[in-house]
Amino acid sequence: MKSVHSSPQNTSHTIMTFYPTMEEFADFNTYVAYMESQGAHQAGLAKVIPPKEWKARQMYDDIEDILIATPLQQVTSGQGGVFTQYHKKKKAMRVGQYRRLANSKKYQTPPHQNFADLEQRYWKSHPGNPPIYGADISGSLFEESTKQWNLGHLGTILDLLEQECGVVIEGVNTPYLYFGMWKTTFAWHTEDMDLYSINYLHFGEPKTWYVVPPEHGQHLERLARELFPDISRGCEAFLRHKVALISPTVLKENGIPFNCMTQEAGEFMVTFPYGYHAGFNHGFNCAEAINFATPRWIDYGKMASQCSCGESTVTFSMDPFVRIVQPESYELWKHRQDLAIVEHTEPRVAESQELSNWRDDIVLRRAALGLRLLPNLTAQCPTQPVSSGHCYNPKGCGTDAVPGSAFQSSAYHTQTQSLTLGMSARVLLPSTGSWGSGRGRGRGQGQGRGCSRGRGHGCCTRELGTEEPTVQPASKRRLLMGTRSRAQGHRPQLPLANDLMTNLSL
């Protein structure tokens, strides 16, 4: 195993790049543990370049008709390297249409000499011409034959959320696709519940990432409260809204340590718990992302604070994680007497016997159901899609997070779309022996936020003087369902334009 490092910006922790062999690439959990043993988590972000013989997908020439149900125009305001961002919903379009739009004269990447030159152009371009992001599309472009690092079934302990509580949250424990163009941006945030995340750039132009080491996350939060006082007064964890852009120059001027890394096609980026990150796309591209967890994350999950205004709430019960991964702390935790202490530099946590037993039990249950022994084939399948804002919890798992934390985590918020079921249809649809397609409708206007009980409250803001709806980023769709019916390896289609165009409410 070998790795290289990026050049740090005012920090002693560097972004490491790893080059696993095919043998090392076979076990996702083991390799993540190795990365942390090398200190990769201390920077908050790491790059993994897969072996040359590995492929996520053989060809990408068959995705032109995938539907982007709710493209989002990203409008920024501000000056001096400090900006806020909001989204305006645009009409649905196919990926082929989006590609042509991204490469048009109006939206194409400007001429530049190198990545550093393009980065300067990016920050100088704000507010400027607002780009359109094809974000938060439920689905996966990984082929079923891809066994290693397939984002649809990584096989981490985040599977406990679905297997023990029957909870599915799109974009958290199911993959999301992101079609980007020049200047499309993800603002400063940490992941929902301070989870890990993994992002694979399938094809296209690069993506630039900024990251603040987890041990300096509170420093960034303090600076953000000073730079955005009006927003911060309305919410204790307003960075969860994913609206704040802060340039590298401003970070340097205020002594905030950070790193920068460019991701190119065919590369993975892994974010670590409580690692604030932001970035932008260099041009037309397609990325896929999902959250995951390791035993080291449990204490972060216990302490993850939540959005206090209700704009962006994604939370779930920590009960199965503490009970199975930290059985020695379970009774204290139930009585709120377990004082978790997060150690940002601790590389890994020993696995409990209960967790080992759980892993063995999953293998036995899959075998009994006649399932293929993939690392994470755990799809729950009610007979009908679950509508946004409604829930069914068969096991009675609570969803209240234990309160009390000095940390202000931020959510990886998403814009709720009309309910187009892509790879999440693997979770939502029964296996019928043929490919399935799901249909449904969201509540529109960015409504249907997930909350601690799975209820959608709905929230929308409208910019004065415009006819198009503007939306604040909403949380990912939360789906609770039975845990008995399982998918049997049949891969449903991503949403196609002909399937859903007539059902859209725009």
Curated annotation (Swiss-Prot):
Residue span, JmjC domain: 143-309
Localisation per UniProt entry: Nucleus
Ranges of residues in domain JmjN: 15-57
Residues covered by region (Disordered): 432-473
UniProt xrefs under PROSITE patterns: JMJC, JMJN
GO molecular function, one term: histone H3K9 demethylase activity
GO terms of biological process kind: chromatin remodeling; regulation of gene expression
Biased composition (Gly residues): 435-453
Keywords, ordered alphabetically: Chromatin regulator, Dioxygenase, Iron, Metal-binding, Nucleus, Oxidoreductase, Transcription, Transcription regulation, Zinc
Cofactor (UniProt): Fe(2+)
Main location: nucleus
Residues that, per the record, bind Fe cation: 189, 191, 277
Annotated residues for binding of 2-oxoglutarate: 133, 199, 207, 242
Cofactor, how bound (note): Binds 1 Fe(2+) ion per subunit.
Binding site for Zn(2+): 235, 241, 307, 309
Catalytic activity: N(6),N(6),N(6)-trimethyl-L-lysyl(9)-[histone H3] + 2 2-oxoglutarate + 2 O2 = N(6)-methyl-L-lysyl(9)-[histone H3] + 2 formaldehyde + 2 succinate + 2 CO2
Gene Ontology cellular component list: chromatin; nucleoplasm; nucleus
The enzyme's E.C. designation: 1.14.11.66
Task of the protein: Histone demethylase that specifically demethylates 'Lys-9' of histone H3, thereby playing a central role in histone code.
Membership in a protein family: Belongs to the JHDM3 histone demethylase family.
Protein's name in the database: Lysine-specific demethylase 4E
